[in-house]
Amino acid sequence: MGELGALQSIVYHRGSLRLLDQRKLPLEVDYIDVKCSGDGWNAIRDMVVRGAPAIAIAAALALAVEVSGLEDFTGTPAEAAVFVSEKLEYLVSSRPTAVNLSDAATKLRSLVSRTAETEKDAKAIFQAYIDAAETMLVDDVSDNKAIGSHGAEFLKQKLEVSKDISVLTHCNTGSLATAGYGTALGVIRALHSGGILEKAFCTETRPFNQGSRLTAFELVHDKVPATLIADSAAAALMKSGCIQAVIVGADRIAANGDTANKIGTYNLAISAKHHGVQFYVAAPITSIDLSLPSGEQIVIEERSPNELLNSEGGLGKQVAASGISVWNPAFDVTPANLITAIITEKGVITKSDADETFNIKDFIQSAKLYSTMQ
């Protein structure tokens, strides 16, 4: 059993990785040991750990634990780099929609390849990899706090209020979906700590219930005033005038701002547009994929039919008629024209006044980040 304390989904010390089994929350707090990339792949695919930032870090650290134990490795530096690269490629296959995982793998592959060109000892390749993976863990928390700060200040200005802001969020984007603090939920935390949040509403987020099981759990833990609603109640909530904004996370953002996120996000965006409610995406720069012109190119993962056929997101008893077919996409794509702004750790990406479109590439260039994303 693990100690929840600060709501850590990832507990890492060099050579050791434990992941909070989020499938058992909120009724049971249990950590599993991850000793190699295979353990990491299974944990990600089986939803032990989820959330785009968290799975990228969990994958990187799973391999860090594995290579830390390769004291008897006798290959060359080039062979060590190939070993790491192949393991990273394998880990990326665990959940293909989230760009954070593939982005982290690309950067780490590049690092070990460059290191292999100058080092004479294979162990130096592994050490460079471990150091880089550990840096990703530390950076994620600071990036999330920056997202929260930028988002809270922007909402305050955009809504032209200094208190009593109520928002709706979807899925889980907090400490359980990241290395700590959270993205969309990080904005909510910042609003709360700043004394300007009246209430946070969260959806169930069926069929895996990340909202009712995880987000509600985090909000109660942090003593944030919050209310859980059924997914199907969101439009009625917006019509009631009880919320001023919707804030969601992202698994992948295309160059034009189209955003892939948990299934049901598109529904919320359409409802928000109809009811005049502002709709925000909060995500790190690593969630942006400039190689994709639009959301049409985003690969959407399909989950097991059991998540719909059985209760508890597929883990419980059968609730649907035997023989019924199932379509169970894990994500949908929200068009950029439904999104008010995109909140990142480097600031808020807004639309141009001229044509109401995002110019994400220019934003990244102005933040001096573009060269690192090629």
From Swiss-Prot:
Its EC number is 5.3.1.23. The active site is at D251 (proton donor). Keywords: Amino-acid biosynthesis, Cytoplasm, Isomerase, Methionine biosynthesis, Nucleus. It is found in: Cytoplasm; Nucleus. Pfam families: IF-2B (PF01008). InterPro entries: IF-2B-related (IPR000649), IF-M1Pi (IPR005251), IF_2B-like_C (IPR042529), Initiation_fac_2B_a/b/d (IPR011559), M1Pi_N (IPR027363), NagB/RpiA_transferase-like (IPR037171). It catalyses: 5-(methylsulfanyl)-alpha-D-ribose 1-phosphate = 5-(methylsulfanyl)-D-ribulose 1-phosphate. Induction: By iron deficiency in roots. The keyword Transport does not apply. GO terms for cellular component: cytoplasm; nucleus. Belongs to the eIF-2B alpha/beta/delta subunits family. MtnA subfamily. PANTHER family: METHYLTHIORIBOSE-1-PHOSPHATE ISOMERASE (PTHR43475:SF1). This is Methylthioribose-1-phosphate isomerase. It comes from Oryza sativa subsp. japonica.
